[in-house]
């Protein structure tokens, strides 16, 4: 099973939807030229973020100067990044903003088409994965992990061999070439406190470049300095906790979006699916493998993400020898709504809570 196949079924559908949305926006007859904002005189700086972590980082940077901004979180209802499709209104909002911030992974392929209709030709576009550069990680299938539609793809391959082996080999060769040219990257870059520091600093630089008021710019820079100090302190707490832990491996009865987090602190993991997977049912082999790892490593917990129904985790536990492990939840921040964010939910607190969960999992 190749990781690149995870997205194959979604691409054509998403592309068709985007074409229809772009056509709808064009029918609305958007006209006019974009201009850089002179914040505080000609208008506010419009910033559009796709997901919650970006939104929260911007809030931290502009703290005390919020009245000079229009800040929008596109996935305001807690929609998952992997399933999100922008509406015509979303595309209109993006087209007129001053700064647009998005992750830049496979799930954001719609952005390219949306930006073609930008009214503001001076828009600053921030692709966070591009900002990270070599820190962005390719998706990986670790031992025991179930590939997307594993059994279905296996049967399809058998049919190809039976009916047209030569064509199948040719398709496989072409697909392999595509894989080498365009590897799939793990999109969950925000689940690293170290990455958050890098990305927040870059975002602050772009915000400051748009504001002509020196005092406000000083505020942004001071806010960033304070925020980075908090994140750096949390990073050190993670390092100390992992060093003091009795174990160094976690088992996830779920999809696994925490690659960046565990890699930061050299934590090993086993999981049912990769982070971008749409699978909800684990195979017998996957369940058996994960349960075996829980027994082998004498683990007292099985972990899930915040939106899990815990069915896989419960099944893993029921297949262990002791059958008494606890289920813990790590929050991947993929279901936070704008209302929750505006009500006080924030990136730092969530990552601090994740640290406490991790401490218990590594006992």
Where does each model-flagged region fall?
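Extreme N-termini of proteins with methionine-enriched Sec-type signal peptides or N-terminal signal-anchor
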Residues: 6, 12-13
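Sec-dependent N-terminal signal peptides
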Residues: 13-23
